[in-house]
Amino acid sequence: MDSRPLTLGEIALARSMFGDAIDYRRVRLFRRKWWPFHPKGAAMAPSGNIHFHPERGGWSEDFSSEPLSLQGFFIHELTHVWQAQARGRLYLPLRRHPFCRYRYRLAPGKPFNAYNPEQQAEIVRHIFLAERGVRLADTPPRSILPF
């Protein structure tokens, strides 16, 4: 199968973080490159769908039944889906440059939107993991999220 919609379990998992901020019916997962130079070790979600390189091991038939680490990866990618749906399909291609940093430093009063797209996705992933018992050094408060 080349693509699929989200499973009911994945939608429930996503709702635990995003609520109704994502139109889950519009999201598809593709087991094919987003563009010809799609790196093998990366999933890409610049257009509101998630693309997995066909030679990469990150694909799942249902992320809700995967280990917590893969669920966190899925939540990270769904943050990019939310960005595309909330800010437009050009948001990621225009804001996410090749040297975009994933690591972030929380700054008091700094709004979520002031972090770059990858940092936003990591913030959401870290909150997701922390709420499920994973101990992280500096977990952001859920109140930083705009959804």
Language-model region placement:
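Metalloprotease/metallohydrolase-associated module, dominated by Zn2+-dependent proteases
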Residues: 2-28, 38-39, 45-48, 85-147
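Short C-terminal domain-edge/linker segments immediately following a structured domain
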Residues: 57-62, 81-85, 104
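Active-site recognition of the HExxH zinc-binding catalytic motif
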Residues: 72-84
